[in-house]
Amino acid sequence: MSRQKKVLAIVLAGGEGKRLMPLTEDRAKPAVPFAGGYRLIDFALSNLVNSGYLQIVVLTQYKSHSLDRHLSETWRLSTQLGNYVTSVPAQQRRGKDWFLGSANAIYQSMNLIDDADPDIVVVVGADHVYRMDFADMVEKHIESGAKATVAGVRQPMEMVKSFGVIETDPQDPAKITRFVEKPDTTAPLPDDPHSFLASMGNYVFDRDALVEALRTDNEKADTDHDMGGDIMPYFAERGEAVVYDFTHNDVPGSTDRDRQYWRDVGTLESYFDSHMDLIRPLPVFNLYNYDWPIYTHQIMAPPARTVRGPNGQAGVAFDSIVSPGVLITGGHVGSSVLSPKVKVEHDARVTESVLMQNVQIGAGATVHRCILDKNVVVPPGTTVGLDREQDLARGLTVTESGLTIAPKNYRFER
């Protein structure tokens, strides 16, 4: 019987997330709250743990305090069995530079690979919403004999400038012939003229091949030290890279409706849209799949409660996620996500919005198509999200699609 391959997982969690500002003004992108009680990194870590990979290092850099705290409070594996989720900041082990890119982050952390001594290295991003069985991807990688495998997902052609693009051999659809980051155009898929194959930012490498590629990249002058922009093209040009088609991935408990759901939430619009996906009557991503759970830190708070207000009007929430500690006192909530300890007072209306922890909505206030970060207080009678010019004058962020975003701890003038 052959020895089972030893796997080390590396999670790239140092991203700044500029397109998610102001949500990333005070935290790293992987630490941005999602769906009430989660952080974005919980999806990557849950997928790895559910896949059976329990030796995980998380490389951090940008404003990592809340991320580090979340990891220490939530992701405690049994170290007696050799399992761990370890947060590793930039340490200047190979010079005086901080991490110069995703590939350089791994290169500077090569000691972690040496210490773990794996056969296979799985590298994943920390800021996507999805379920995935990485064990199947690793198995297909080993069977292929390739040195590098990248997970690919179909995306509409109009999104080509937003992703790393995978082009394959028509005679061998798994073999990558070209990998390029965010090109202006690319050829559509042979079986679908409206789609191309995008990189999911998830990779599997033979350990020795990855180490050699990182060392080669470090010696080059014309490099961004990026996994997608530099390392994957290195393997593609050598004919040593294959693609793993995400449509073939199947996790326990998935349905035809939510199978292969994957969302890059790197913009305010995509972040908002992903929340709206969760609250449809038939959600396209099912948080309630207990066969493949998404783990997180469970906040200590009493159950959510809806009660009548002083005028006798019932507190109502429909088509919404209502987290522990939420109190709706005669208010109206529709098509929204309410994080822990949110309060909605009587005669207030909250529609199509994402409210983070401890947001307070005063009596008679109206909130529509908004993302309100932690601790935002909306005074009684205030309207947010219906008057673009007024919200801009308040210093709020308003997107082209009309989303209004209030940063953490924002206070409205009464």
From Swiss-Prot:
It comes from the Bacteria. Its EC number is 2.7.7.27. GO terms for biological process: glycogen biosynthetic process. One of its GO terms (molecular function) is glucose-1-phosphate adenylyltransferase activity. It catalyses: alpha-D-glucose 1-phosphate + ATP + H(+) = ADP-alpha-D-glucose + diphosphate. Pathway: Glycan biosynthesis; glycogen biosynthesis. Alpha-D-glucose 1-phosphate binds at residues 164, 181-182, 199. Keywords: ATP-binding, Carbohydrate metabolism, Glycogen biosynthesis, Glycogen metabolism, Nucleotide-binding, Nucleotidyltransferase, Transferase. InterPro entries: ADP-Glc_PPase (IPR011831), ADP_Glu_pyroP_CS (IPR005836), GlgC_bac (IPR023049), GlmU/GlgC-like_hexapep (IPR056818), NTP_transferase_dom (IPR005835), Nucleotide-diphossugar_trans (IPR029044), Trimer_LpxA-like_sf (IPR011004). It holds the Pfam family Hexapep_GlmU. Belongs to the bacterial/plant glucose-1-phosphate adenylyltransferase family. Homotetramer. Involved in the biosynthesis of ADP-glucose, a building block required for the elongation reactions to produce glycogen. Catalyzes the reaction between ATP and alpha-D-glucose 1-phosphate (G1P) to produce pyrophosphate and ADP-Glc. This is Glucose-1-phosphate adenylyltransferase. The lineage of its organism: Bacteria, Bacillati, Actinomycetota, Actinomycetes, Micrococcales.
